[in-house]
Regions:
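Nucleotide/phosphate-binding catalytic cleft detector across ATP-hydrolyzing
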Residues: 1-16, 20-208
Length: 209
């Protein structure tokens, strides 16, 4: 049997900080293994205003989830919200040199990475880029184009943008709590992962930067 795959989510909210540990099953579903929750006193409207209090709350929530799940938590996927978060819609295009060669993961990744280069307002940074659909030679509605043939790959992306200082403060809290950041993801999307395994796949494969 292969080693279990665990996904850890951390919600840094205004009223509470919660940590949840899920095990990814062979069928793609997630089974909850542990949960921890503490009061949040260092966060207001999705922004950290007291580093020390927030770090302490993160440590306590993670410790509870770790004890309940019997999992040594070293990294987390952080759900974020707040007035400083906004989302943009962008389309990427890649013209291929050889239409008879199968579309590769490298090409799809290039389309995605190009989204991190789009122009945004000063003081903001791109938190995450989520592919919504692919268009191959003007044929829309394609979810997974890997292995297909075509001259042109297009993709519609959901680009999540946040205030740089707010994002850095969250990352700082995670690091001071002795954890690594796997992903930062918009809370409604993180909530949808409970029902959509494809979002869970995104959380385990997509990196913050």
């Amino acid at each position: 049997m292969s080693d279990p795959v665990y996904i850890v989510g951390l919600d840094i909210g205004t009223t509470k900080i919660a940590c949840i540990v899920g095990e990814k099953m062979p069928n793609g579903k997630i089974e909850i293994r542990g949960y921890g929750k503490t009061d949040s006193t260092g966060v207001k409207r999705g922004m950290v205003f007291n580093i020390e209090e927030t770090v302490d709350a993160i440590k306590r929530a993670v410790a509870q989830a770790s004890e309940q799940s019997k999992v040594d938590i070293k990294s987390v996927n952080v759900g974020i919200a707040g007035h400083h978060i906004k989302s943009l819609q962008h389309r990427g295009v890649l013209i291929r040199e050889n239409a008879d060669v199968e579309i590769s993961n490298e090409e799809l990744d290039k389309l995605k990475q190009d989204m991190y280069k789009i122009a945004i307002s000063p003081g903001e940074e791109i938190i995450n880029v989520i592919p919504q659909e692919y268009i191959i030679d003007d044929e829309p509605g394609i979810r997974q184009p890997k292995g297909m043939l075509g001259n042109k790959i297009e993709a519609n992306f959901h680009v999540i943008v946040g205030q740089t200082s707010a994002v850095k403060n969250i990352v700082k809290c995670i690091e001071h709590a002795g954890l690594e950041m796997e992903n930062m993801i918009l809370e409604p999307i993180a909530s949808a992962s409970v029902f959509m395994p494809s979002i869970v796949s995104l959380m385990t494969s997509s990196k913050l930067m």
